[in-house]
Swiss-Prot record:
The modification Phosphoserine is found at S174. One of its GO terms (cellular component) is nucleus. Functions in trans to edit the amino acid moiety from incorrectly charged tRNA(Ala). It is found in: Cytoplasm. This is Alanyl-tRNA editing protein Aarsd1. The gene is AARSD1.
Length: 412
């Protein structure tokens, strides 16, 4: 059985009757990215204008009597609509589809059929699967690689067919119809019942499909192939946008271009060269900065070594610096008799720490210092270093070390 959304992909609302409404749960992804379970109801209607997930196409969103439908799934010949409000069986309801989402899916799905057919016709490249993503779609082709010329030829051909305004129609064939054997497709679901649905692009392609499609290729507006990516099992993913997604992509790209023009103070044609120059300048500055930091670390190490306060616990904190900076100081000092506690980072945030000195003392104190600074670390051979999330507790860590030294001195 075909749902109303399949018989008329352009229908935006539909009046029907509630068949059943049962308590159900839906696993979904929350705003924090974690899985959460929603309690609600599984509503079955006599027919529906909301497409249930299938054929590589995501399900529709919409409303039933202004009640939001959060998921639509197919179960045999019926569609289950998940809502968080119950509906009375036997009642008449108005079902409305989220048209922006639906039309986007129609453009991407029909675009996939067209690209698949053209890739096969031009280069005998077979489609093994496809994915309709939130921002872009991918067609997996049974080839280890594609040339830029092949990609360009496919893009040119599909857009020519869009300009030719070729009609797209849907037919239903019985399972025993001889024509079924001549139709492309990757098979039917195990629970499929009823006639076979065939989507035909006039003179281009005829394919088994359960999805919603445009009625004419002109509704695709344009297809842009963004390129290829390496796929699984020695295959290639062809990345594409169709219809309104191309316009949105162009709008984002133009916005980025304008922003870069203002930042780089040059025309779009010079952006790449300007960024390369900035990268080269940054590398030189980073190298010079590293050399200066190393010289500073050596100077600091010698100053600490010759300080009248040398002995017990030697403490140094700097806002600027990195792990290498601290290790240079520790290497230059090279003492296993004195505890050296070095920290770098913002006192109001996180940073890095290093504890060096007598191996037994460092082994004991390292994890405790990490705990005080609410960080993590590891070490061996008289050196323990790691990341701290609370550099504001640095004074507590210093007190811990000084207490330890005082206790050790008292024992001696």
């Amino acid at each position: 059985m075909a749902f109303w959304c399949q018989r008329d992909s352009y229908a935006r609302e539909f009046t029907t009757t509630v068949v059943s409404c049962c308590p159900a749960e839906l696993q979904t992804e929350g705003s924090n990215g974690k899985k959460e379970v929603l309690s609600g109801f599984q509503v079955v209607l006599e027919d529906t204008v909301l497409f249930p997930e299938g054929g590589g196409q995501p399900d529709d969103r919409g409303t039933i009597n202004d009640i939001s439908v959060l998921r639509v799934t197919r179960r045999g010949e019926q569609a289950d609509h998940f809502t968080q409000t119950p509906l009375d069986p036997g009642s008449q309801v108005l079902v409305r589809v989220d048209w922006e989402r639906r039309f986007d899916h129609m453009q991407q799905h029909s675009g996939q059929h067209l690209i698949t057919a053209v890739a096969d016709h031009l280069f005998k490249l077979k489609t093994t699967s496809w994915e309709l993503g939130r921002f872009r779609s991918a067609i997996e082709l049974d080839t280890p690689s594609m040339t830029a010329e092949q990609v360009a030829a496919i893009e040119q051909s599909v857009n020519e067919k869009i300009r030719d305004r070729l009609p797209v129609n849907v037919r239903e064939l019985s399972l025993d119809d001889p024509e079924v054997e001549q139709v492309s497709g990757r098979g039917l679901p195990d629970d499929h019942a009823g006639p076979i649905r065939v989507v035909n692009i006039e003179g281009v392609d005829s394919n088994m499909c359960c999805g919603t499609h445009v009625s004419n290729l002109s509704d695709l507006q344009v297809i842009k192939i963004l390129g290829t990516e390496k796929g699984k099992k020695n295959r290639t993913n062809l990345i594409f946008l169709s219809g309104n997604r191309v316009l949105k992509w162009m709008e984002r790209s133009h916005g980025t271009e304008k922003a870069l023009t203002a930042l780089l103070k040059c025309g779009a044609e010079d952006h790449v060269e300007a960024v390369k120059k900035l990268q080269n300048s940054t590398k030189i500055l980073q190298k010079n900065n590293l050399n200066l930091l190393r010289d500073l670390a050596v100077h600091i190490a010698h100053s600490l070594r010759n300080s009248p306060d040398w002995g017990g616990v030697v403490i140094l904190h700097r806002k600027e610096g990195d792990s290498e900076f601290m290790n240079i100081i520790a290497n230059e000092i090279g003492s296993e008799e004195t505890l050296l506690f070095l920290t770098v980072g913002d006192e109001k945030g996180g940073g890095l720490f290093l504890l060096a000195g007598p191996p037994a003392s460092v082994e004991t104190l390292g994890p405790r210092v990490a705990e005080v600074l609410e960080g993590k670390g590891a070490g061996k051979k008289g050196r323990f270093q790691g990341k701290a999330t609370k550099m504001s507790r640095r004074m507590e860590a210093q007190a811990l070390l000084q207490d330890y030294i005082s206790t050790q001195s008292a024992k001696e």
